């Protein structure tokens, strides 16, 4: 499967801004947009929370991988991933070999602030409680981030989303992605010229 540098996979923890930044970024780049979680919900006719509750995380990760596989050869598309998508190794490998990974980075304190009132994040609920206190949530986020960090940090492009307007983040991402795609295309063209007899 050929790598498409203009197939942009947005990753980051829940609350990092993928769903709000994704459509604006796609519009800025002139690309199509897909939110993988929303596409799965539409396909399955149930929420992600319900899929986790009824079928478990493993079943959800398989649905997620299959959905990503359907767009793996697309060009000029921004795909917003679920926060834990990269934990599933086959999905991580599929993304790494088919597109460009972009990490929206945010610190645990800011993530906890944004996620405190959300009830639709199945992996963030502490055992036995629907909604943990803010400090417990921050500790939970820090622990999950530590586990996910190596794959998040493998992204070709990283942008910090803390203390920034969404518009500024979109502008920064647009510049970095356009520069990256141009550079990779140029490298590939040079390699093709070298391969010619």
Swiss-Prot record:
How is the cofactor bound, as the UniProt entry phrases it? Binds 1 Mg(2+) ion per subunit.
Q: What is its EC class?
A: transferase
Q: Could you state one GO cellular component term attached to this entry? A: cytosol
Q: Does the keyword Amino-acid biosynthesis apply?
A: yes
Identify the domain of life. Answer: Bacteria
Supply the alphabetized keyword list.
Amino-acid biosynthesis, Aromatic amino acid biosynthesis, ATP-binding, Cytoplasm, Kinase, Magnesium, Metal-binding, Nucleotide-binding, Transferase
Q: Which GO terms describe its molecular function?
A: ATP binding; magnesium ion binding; shikimate kinase activity
Catalytic activity from the UniProt record: shikimate + ATP = 3-phosphoshikimate + ADP + H(+)
**Pfam families in the record, alphabetically?**
SKI
Q: In which pathway does it act?
A: Metabolic intermediate biosynthesis; chorismate biosynthesis; chorismate from D-erythrose 4-phosphate and phosphoenolpyruvate: step 5/7
Tell me which residues bind substrate. Answer: 37, 61, 83, 148
- The EC number on file is 2.7.1.71
Q: Which SUPFAM superfamilies match?
A: P-loop containing nucleoside triphosphate hydrolases
Cellular compartment(s): Cytoplasm
Binding annotation for ATP: 15-20, 121
Read off the InterPro entries from this record.
P-loop_NTPase, Shikimate/glucono_kinase, Shikimate_kinase/TSH1
Q: Which PANTHER family match?
A: SHIKIMATE KINASE, SHIKIMATE KINASE 1, CHLOROPLASTIC
Tell me the subunit arrangement. Monomer.
Q: What does this protein do?
A: Catalyzes the specific phosphorylation of the 3-hydroxyl group of shikimic acid using ATP as a cosubstrate.
Question: Family per UniProt?
Answer: Belongs to the shikimate kinase family.
Q: Which HAMAP family match?
A: Shikimate_kinase
Per its record, how is this protein called by name? Shikimate kinase
